[in-house]
Amino acid sequence: MPTINQLIAQPRKIQRSRNKVPALDACPQKRGVCTRVYTTTPKKPNSALRKVAKVRLTNGFEVIGYIPGEGHNLQEHSVVMIRGGRVKDLPGVRYHILRGVLDTQGVKNRKQRRSKYGAKRPK
């Protein structure tokens, strides 16, 4: 613990919280173009092939976005919208790709939580 004299000489530094989604530039979503669509494996103890895409955003950032839901139609040069939100078991994946927006189709046969996956209401 510092003495009073030490604090007078050098006051305490204010701890600034770092931005968890710097590529969004304080916007709720950003548009981008897929440069690579691939699968990757999660950290231990989980095991799967998670679908992700490398996206070049309109502001020049290149980020990795997670593609949620079962099945997708994304390929290289698809135009997508990303939002913030990391995937805990995929290191480096700090963004989600929005389903049912721009070139990304919604999840087929989705009955519950449809708004999260861009699925229309079943007839």
From Swiss-Prot:
PROSITE patterns, per the entry: RIBOSOMAL_S12
Which BP terms from GO are recorded?
Answer: translation
Keywords in UniProt for this one? Methylation, Ribonucleoprotein, Ribosomal protein, RNA-binding, rRNA-binding, tRNA-binding
Stored Pfam families: Ribosom_S12_S23
A GO term for molecular function? rRNA binding
Record flagged with keyword Chaperone: no
Q: Which domain of life is it from?
A: Bacteria
The yes or no answer to whether the keyword tRNA processing is present is no
Could you state one GO cellular component term attached to this entry?
A: small ribosomal subunit
Q: Which residues carry this modification: 3-methylthioaspartic acid?
A: 89
InterPro entries, per the entry: NA-bd_OB-fold, Ribosomal_uS12, Ribosomal_uS12_bac
Question: According to its UniProt entry, what is the function of this protein?
Answer: With S4 and S5 plays an important role in translational accuracy.
- Share what the entry says about its subunit structure, partners included: Part of the 30S ribosomal subunit. Contacts proteins S8 and S17. May interact with IF1 in the 30S initiation complex.
Report the PANTHER family cross-referenced here: 30S RIBOSOMAL PROTEIN S12 FAMILY MEMBER (PTHR11652)
Q: Which family does it belong to?
A: Belongs to the universal ribosomal protein uS12 family.
Name of the molecule in the record: Small ribosomal subunit protein uS12
Q: Which gene encodes it?
A: rpsL
